[in-house]
Amino acid sequence: MRKKLMALGIIFLVLIAGINVTKTIIQDNQAIDAFLLHVTLQGEYKIGDGEWKPIVAGEHISAGKGDVTLRGSLHMAFPNGEIVAPVSQNSSVVFFLDHLGGNVNMDGQEPYVFDSENNRIGKATCGEYWFIYGYEGAESEIVEIHLTNPHVYGNEFAIDEFLSSMRMYESGYFERMMAEDTAGLKIVGYCITLVAIIIIGIALFSTLIRLDVSKIMWYAGAAIFFAGTYFVADATNTYIWNMNIALTTTIFVLSIMLYGFFLGAFTSICFEKPFKKVGYGTMAVSGAITGGLLIFTLFSNTKLYDVFAVWIILQTITAAVLLVISCINVRYVKGMMRLVQIVFIISLIAMILDVVGTRYGWWQGCCCSSIVFIIQFFAALFAVLLV
């Protein structure tokens, strides 16, 4: 009873600390936003050679159906969308580019070119970054922005992000705001990674003394570790002067790939004997193909982000096979192992939903998997404390 009360006390302290940090971040961001007005583009857009359509706030514009051309005038606005005034000459506007290239055109001026894929910014700069654009036009002058997406998968929402993230640039305030916006997610990522390192350390010790649980600990530690690095990479804001754009993208993609693999391996090792061979065989094929894709990118000019679409197909098939086996296997296990199997089933369903959701523009990135993982991770920590 005393141990449980102590554990509940620790949980309470952690929750209160987290609430205080969240409250501070929210209040501080409100103060900073007063200095950085948003920028809206009032006008129209077209995809490829299609018809011009009005730009409507909150309406999805696909980045995967061809080049997108935006045309209209730039206006400063409050975060709620209320227009303040047209953007004036010699103002600095910041754009967020999610694997996009393009240019800004105005009558009588040379095109203003930006491209995250060319060598002007750095070698192999495939990734996300912020770009500062010096507006030289008159107030309410028509600008035309042409955006190109070199990828076939992964950044379906890039145009939406481009439009919603435009804001006035003020040196110092912008950088501080971006850092604080992602501080919470980075802290979560670092905490998860730290726990993973501890688990891997326990796995190493267990292997040395030949405990049966060592293999499970290795797979669990690896899956948790790459989940942590994913959160850190996803929260990394790359500014115009930061030359680590490609590195951040590589860590981001590898984290997703390796988390998926080790989650599958962890799931397979918990199967009952009739299903273990099928699970191991599935993961062996998945691991071999994943390794082949990584080797291919090493010895070719193909970027890691471009094999993401192929890996997604592989991961969908792998997750579907493991999901079917897990649903059958759950009938043969009892007690805590049944609960563990249900946890794996939920994780596999979340992964499949993320793949489909990203492909068809329902939501962005690993939304389901991230939420499911965080809930399961902290639930597991609390369960350990209560034991």
List where the protein language model places each region.
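Interfacial "cap-and-anchor" motif at the non-cytosolic start of specific transmembrane alpha-helices
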Residues: 228-269, 273-387
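Aromatic-lined ligand-binding clefts that engage carbohydrates, nucleic acids, or primary amines
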Residues: 82-106, 143-145
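First transmembrane helix
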Residues: 170, 176-210, 309-330
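Extracellular beta-rich ligand/substrate-recognition surface
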Residues: 59-70, 117-127
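Juxtamembrane interface at the cytosolic side of transmembrane helices
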Residues: 199-229, 272
